[in-house]
Amino acid sequence: MDIAQLVDMLSHMAHQAGQAINDKMNGNDLLNPESMIKAQFALQQYSTFINYESSLIKMIKDMLSGIIAKI
């Protein structure tokens, strides 16, 4: 398992989700309820990617700390 590749993939997906937010905020009339729902969904996707990436990095750090502590 290549951890760097996994983190890079998650970072790329988070970047794409961030771009989707920019597109939704700039391109549409935010007074339209449908546009607001789409923007909210894009924000939720971005938040989910960031939280998942953060949790994964913390899990790896904790695992490595546990291994080092046992050495």
UniProtKB/Swiss-Prot annotation:
Pfam families the record matches: T3SS_needle_F (PF09392)
GO CC list: cell surface; extracellular region; type III protein secretion system complex
Domain of life assignment: Bacteria
Induction line: Expressed when residing in the host ileal loop, host macrophages, and when in an acidic environment. Repressed by methyl-3,4-dephostatin.
Keywords attached to this entry: Protein transport, Secreted, Transport, Virulence
SUPFAM superfamilies: MxiH-like
Cellular location(s): Secreted; Cell surface
GO terms classed as biological process: protein secretion by the type III secretion system
Residue stretches spanning the membrane: none
Subunit structure: The core secretion machinery of the T3SS is composed of approximately 20 different proteins, including cytoplasmic components, a base, an export apparatus and a needle. This subunit polymerizes and forms the helical needle filament.
Role played: Component of the type III secretion system (T3SS), also called injectisome, which is used to inject bacterial effector proteins into eukaryotic host cells. SsaG/SctF2 forms the external needle filament that protrudes from the bacterial surface.
Family: Belongs to the SctF family.
Name assigned to this protein: SPI-2 type 3 secretion system needle filament protein
Gene for this chain: sctF2
